[in-house]
């Protein structure tokens, strides 16, 4: 009886593993559709290196990578916005944008909305410029790491000295 459950579990793992080979993330098919539309598979696309991949490879720490990824995602959102009226690729862009929301924003709609609002501010708008300068000092203060407030460690030599003398 015990062995049958092991065999069934093993078979389940094999079936699920083989299904994983045939399943792709939804964005892969849609990205291929966009590649066709933009002729991104042509050999001249590789001229002068990559736009984003070398940058992502350079930065290994999670915080640094998040900063770079946010700029890259901002670029893609702007690109998709420029082609939002194009019916032939609209589904692909929406699928990829939705997948970015899941992967980058952890499906947090408010976080994505705030991100998009930030990327949509026009730097040529006088009112936006004035507000940005007005908030600059507070923004700079937020960028600074918060001072660490914690307990000081006691010197262990004090305790070691007592043990040695006893």
Curated annotation (Swiss-Prot):
Tissues/organs with expression: Released primarily from activated T lymphocytes.
Gene3D superfamilies according to UniProt: 1.20.1250.10
Pfam families assigned to the protein according to its UniProt record, in alphabetical order: IFN-gamma
Annotated InterPro entries: 4_helix_cytokine-like_core, Interferon_gamma
Principal cellular location given in the protein's record: secreted
Sites of Pyrrolidone carboxylic acid modification: 24
Glycosylation sites: 48, 86, 120
Gene Ontology biological process terms, A to Z: adaptive immune response; defense response to virus; humoral immune response
Signal peptide interval: 1-23
GO MF terms, alphabetically ordered: cytokine activity; type II interferon receptor binding
Keywords: Antiviral defense, Cytokine, Glycoprotein, Growth regulation, Pyrrolidone carboxylic acid, Secreted, Signal
Any single Gene Ontology cellular-component annotation: extracellular space
Subcellular location as annotated: Secreted
Function of the molecule: Type II interferon produced by immune cells such as T-cells and NK cells that plays crucial roles in antimicrobial, antiviral, and antitumor responses by activating effector immune cells and enhancing antigen presentation. Primarily signals through the JAK-STAT pathway after interaction with its receptor IFNGR1 to affect gene regulation. Upon IFNG binding, IFNGR1 intracellular domain opens out to allow association of downstream signaling components JAK2, JAK1 and STAT1, leading to STAT1 activation, nuclear translocation and transcription of IFNG-regulated genes.
Family: Belongs to the type II (or gamma) interferon family.
Oligomer status and interactors: Homodimer. Interacts with IFNGR1 (via extracellular domain); this interaction promotes IFNGR1 dimerization.
Protein name as catalogued: Interferon gamma
Organism the protein comes from: Saimiri sciureus (Common squirrel monkey)
Classification of source organism: Eukaryota, Metazoa, Chordata, Craniata, Vertebrata
Gene: IFNG
């Amino acid at each position: 009886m015990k062995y049958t459950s092991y065999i069934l579990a093993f078979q389940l793992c094999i079936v699920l593993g083989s299904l994983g080979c045939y399943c792709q993330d939804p964005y892969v098919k849609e990205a291929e559709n966009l590649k066709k539309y933009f002729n991104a598979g042509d050999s001249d696309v590789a001229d002068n290196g990559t736009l984003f991949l070398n940058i992502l490879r350079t930065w290994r720490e999670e915080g640094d990578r998040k900063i770079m990824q946010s700029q890259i995602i901002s670029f893609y959102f702007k690109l998709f916005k420029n082609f939002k009226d194009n019916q032939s690729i609209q589904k692909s862009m929406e699928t990829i944008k939705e997948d970015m929301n899941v992967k980058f924003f952890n499906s947090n709609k408010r976080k994505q909305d705030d991100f998009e609002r930030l990327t949509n501010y026009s730097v040529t708008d006088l009112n936006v410029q004035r507000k940005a300068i007005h908030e600059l000092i507070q923004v700079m203060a937020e960028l600074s790491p918060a001072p660490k407030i914690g307990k000081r460690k006691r010197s262990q030599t004090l305790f070691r000295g007592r043990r040695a003398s006893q």
